[in-house]
Amino acid sequence: MGTGGQNGLRPGKGNTEGVKEGKGKTDEVTMTSNTDASASCQYRCIECNQEAKELYRDYNHGVLKITICKSCQKPVDKYIEYDPVIILINAILCKAQAYRHILFNTKINMHGKLCVFCLLCEAYLRWWQLQDSSQSIDPDDFIRYAKEWDFYRMFAIASLEQTAYFIGIFAFLWVERPIRAKEKLNFTLLLKALLLSSYGKLLLIPAVIWEHDYTPLCLRLIKVFVLTSNFQAIRVTLNINRKLAFLAILSGLLVESTMVYFFQRMEWAVGSDCAIYKSQDF
């Protein structure tokens, strides 16, 4: 079992060409191994955030052994043996280990789809609040088309506000970057982390469907949960302290609030009856 995880390479036999061919193959395999090793260093220990070359060693006959971190002497990623439901629960609890597992040690390519779906949920909430504030029993087709375009408008506004929120976070981290003078910031990974950590917005639809007296409170709690998830995602992705992550969130909220104020002034200037920004939670 000790040799199951290693592969040997033999040079050609019987002539010089075989030896040369074997050396050439050895060099090629060595270069490939170095490339794979550098690529595999993208794994992270979920406990101490140190880089790791592998998560586990695969031996013969399906025998797996979890890699132990050289820094903290703990398993690099214990979640590879966990059920996805357990991982989701730990992510909901905003555990840093679960976030590191999802962001660094798994391949998830649903960031764009999740972002669009969350924006649709938020647009539906705004559209629902708009229709609730201006009820009309006129069955005219023009009224129905106007309501449909209101939904598209809410989707565009939600997209712009979320973009402003992300720009505020990125701008703060970019300005703060020379002060820290550390490794280069991976804004692509940070964007994916922020998109994934915004999954709490999916709870907007159940909150609207099962409407009750505590719906406004539920919407505020969902907002707090999303901000907390974004806060933890920034901490885990950039490996920064809580103070910087908190200031980054505040910067994003400041830019987003500026965008909301701009839309308020714009709607007031054109005389629109769209006043949902004054009473909505998102």
From Swiss-Prot:
Compositionally skewed regions (Basic and acidic residues) per UniProt: 18-28
Keyword Amino-acid biosynthesis part of the UniProt annotation: no
Membrane topology: Multi-pass membrane protein
GO biological process, one term: regulation of intracellular cholesterol transport
Location in the cell: Endoplasmic reticulum membrane
GO cellular component terms given for this protein: cortical endoplasmic reticulum; endoplasmic reticulum membrane; Golgi apparatus
UniProt entry tagged with the keyword Coiled coil: no
UniProt KW keywords: Cholesterol metabolism, Endoplasmic reticulum, Lipid metabolism, Lipid transport, Membrane, Steroid metabolism, Sterol metabolism, Transmembrane, Transmembrane helix, Transport
Region (Disordered): 1-31
A Pfam short name: Arv1
Transmembrane domains' residue ranges: 155-175, 189-209, 244-264
Family classification: Belongs to the ARV1 family.
Function according to Swiss-Prot or TrEMBL: Plays a role as a mediator in the endoplasmic reticulum (ER) cholesterol and bile acid homeostasis. Participates in sterol transport out of the ER and distribution into plasma membranes.
Annotated protein name in UniProt: Protein ARV1
